[in-house]
Design a protein with these regions (language model features):
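Anionic-ligand binding region
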Residues: 133-177, 188
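Glycine/small-residue-rich loop that forms an oxyanion/phosphate-binding "nest" at active or ligand-binding sites
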Residues: 64-114
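Short, polar loop motifs at secondary-structure junctions
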Residues: 27-36, 94-98, 134-136, 154-160, ...
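Glycine-rich, highly charged phosphate/nucleotide-binding loops
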Residues: 41-57, 176-190
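A structural signal for small-residue-enriched, beta-sheet-centric alpha/beta enzyme cores
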Residues: 264-267, 414-420, 425-572, 581-582, ...
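N-terminal beta-loop-helix "entrance" segment that forms/cooperates
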Residues: 26-48, 103-105, 161-167, 303-306
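Generic N-terminal targeting/processing segments that precede catalytic cores or assembly contacts
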Residues: 260-408, 412
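A C-terminal functional module that forms or caps the active site or interfaces directly
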Residues: 165-173, 177-224, 229-233
Length: 606
């Protein structure tokens, strides 16, 4: 079991990530006031002293602790560390992402130093607004005793008000953060309005990171010429395994408890190319060859990626996790060289052997460019410049087996020749994810649109596509798009891309599910509704002999052999009518044609 300490934005993200595993875990908060939906998580409420934590971990067979608590919950962090050492439990620290420390801000180590600085006779404060939370009220009372006007900004909940009163605050000294439901104004605008009303000469903040609104508060204060003093975040205990995002969290859990997630995540080709490029830069520019490099993902978090080195640069062996990806195990290489001309773009990215070339429009790079998508290009450039801001380099990405593997991908159909694409949006592959499959469908639909054809022909796979291509012999190959099981989503994409004509080619197994209103026909989502099939047969109408035979079928395709040939066209019309009922509303401004295909490739239409 996993024990999570949360109550924060990071705690909420931890829950979302762990819930995907479908396995139970414990989620502990001090106050129990966080509004969070738990399906497999088991909520715990209240402080957990060291001895209680030890007893709980032992009695519930805890094998991993995730510390996603507030960075300033120092007592809890050190309690977790002591329990971890005593029970030999690994701890993952879900840390926040912190911006670089702004030199325009006055940085202090703790409240004691803050009080000394605020009462310094050379630069004394007169009016101080603390945004450090309700727990800061008692700590800052010495300022009030010295005649300094204090205000405290706290959360708008009853427990915070009660605690504020207990610590000596009065109503005139309290102001509140916007309610979570207040979406009319940005946080910065609310900060500005508050600062202008109170006119403090100092705003006291904690280094709470991006999710704590640190930059918004400090930017607003500095823009008004207000002095900002920030308390540095406490140093975490040694031994914690630190992540700063949901992807890194999942991969760390997969590493420590491999059985928790039934399926493991992987890395996109874009992330692998980025890691290889960054490693090659370390070798060229610093004469260093680290075994892992820190890769910043598009969401801002950083994950470690293992790298290898060779004569021309560095490489990464692609790990696709449990995703059925033909690129799994490929070596993705990067070599770097100096541009020799500071007038060039800082980082020039090229495709080498095994990286495809774009030959058709519809991509985020022009025809003739290497098939390295926009997000991977940005990742490569941003990661290199994060470490080497003055670098002027040419980066060449190569995939030695890319040309061979490309034959087993969508690339030939998309007009990408000579190799595979370097792709990725999040940088991480979620195994068998619907999002990943829909993204590939969307790319195919965009290429189909860029072809200039008015019609897109969507089909379930290679078999049905072969038959519908025979039905539309004059159409180019790129307008034939596989939907897998996501019929509804694919039609919606066609509508969003303003296709005037859409043809849906469907075989009977999926058609009977679709006719019953199931727009996702995956066997995990739905099975054939035999009673509905029998109702459609009666609608034909078929006689009782056919009905009795149909009652015994296992697969829908058996119906082709049961229904008399003279009634097949009418049966097809009934099935298509019901499919059309559910699909047509998804294409309100286009014309939908549905083709029902039998096992021999005969095509029926209404």
């Amino acid at each position: 079991m996993i024990l999570v300490f949360g109550g924060t934005t990071e705690g909420r993200k931890t829950v979302a990530e762990l819930e995907e595993a479908g396995n139970p875990f414990f989620y502990s908060t001090k106050q129990g006031e966080q509004n969070i939906a738990l399906q497999h998580g088991i909520p715990l409420c209240g402080a957990m002293p060291e001895n209680d934590m030890i007893a709980f971990c032992r009695s519930h067979s805890i094998r991993l602790i995730i510390d996603a608590a507030h960075p300033f919950a120092a007592h809890l962090h050190h309690t977790i560390a002591r329990v971890s050492r005593q029970l030999h439990l690994p701890v993952i620290r879900y840390e926040r992402i912190y911006p670089p420390r702004n030199p325009a801000i006055q940085w202090v180590a703790d409240y004691d130093e803050a009080i000394r600085m605020l009462t310094d006779k050379n630069k004394p404060a007169k009016r101080v607004l603390s945004t450090c939370g309700v727990q800061s009220i008692s700590r800052l009372q010495p300022l009030k005793q010295r005649g300094i006007q204090l205000w405290f900004r706290i959360l708008p909940r009853q427990s915070s008000r009660v605690l504020a009163y207990e610590q000596g605050a009065c109503d005139d000294e309290l102001c509140y953060y916007p309610s979570p439901s207040d979406t009319e104004r940005s946080t910065t605008e609310d900060d500005v309005a508050l600062f202008e009303r109170l006119q403090p000469d100092v705003v006291l903040v904690k280094e709470s990171g991006e999710s704590g609104g640190f930059e918004e508060k400090t930017r607003a204060a500095l823009s008004l010429g207000i002095r900002v003093m920030a308390i540095k975040r406490p140093v975490m205990p040694e031994g914690f395994l630190t992540v700063d995002g949901e992807h890194g969290l999942r991969r760390m859990v997969e590493h420590i408890l491999p059985e928790f997630y039934p399926l493991h995540s992987g890395l996109t080709t874009g992330t692998c190319a980025t890691a290889a490029a960054l490693a090659a830069c370390f070798r060229l520019l610093k004469d260093e060859c680290p075994k892992t490099v820190p890769v910043i993902l598009p969401n801002g978090e950083t994950i470690p990626v293992d790298v290898l080195y060779h004569d021309d640069g560095a490489s990464v062996i692609k790990d696709s996790g449990d995703d059925p990806d033909v690129t799994n195990g490929l070596e993705i290489q990067a070599s770097v060289s100096h541009t020799g001309d500071a007038q060039h773009e800082n980082i020039i990215i090229k495709g080498g052997k095994g990286v495809g070339t774009i030959t058709l429009p519809g991509f985020d790079s022009p025809v003739g460019e290497s098939a390295i998508n926009r997000v991977p290009r940005e990742m490569i450039r941003d990661n290199i410049l994060a470490h080497f801001p003055d670098a002027h380099l040419v980066v060449t990405i190569s995939i030695p087996q890319g040309e061979e593997i490309a034959r087993r991908t969508f690339n030939p159909r998309l007009g990408i020749v000579g190799g595979i694409s370097v792709v990725g949006v999040s940088g991480i592959i979620k195994p068998f994810s619907k999002a990943g499959f829909l993204d590939s469908i969307k790319k195919c639909m965009q290429v189909a649109k860029a072809s200039g054809c008015d019609r897109v022909v969507i089909n379930s796979g290679a078999k049905s596509e072969r038959f519908v291509k025979g039905y539309y012999p004059a159409l180019p190959s790129q307008v034939f798009v596989e939907y897998g099981n996501y019929i509804g989503d694919t039609i919606r994409m066609a509508s969003e891309l303003h296709f005037p004509q859409v043809t849906l080619g469907v075989m009977l197994g999926k058609a009977v599910k679709l006719a019953a209103g199931n727009l996702d026909t995956h066997s995990k989502k739905t099975v054939m509704d035999k009673s509905f099939v029998l109702d459609m047969l009666r609608e034909v109408p078929c006689d009782d002999t056919v009905i009795r035979q149909a009652e015994q079928i296992t697969l829908a395709r058996e119906l082709w052999k049961i229904i008399p040939e003279s009634q097949l066209q009418r049966f097809a019309e009934v099935v298509i009518k019901h499919c059309y009922h559910y699909c047509a509303p998804l294409l309100p401004k286009g014309q939908l044609t549905i083709l029902l295909i039998d096992e021999e490739g005969n095509i029926y239409h209404s």
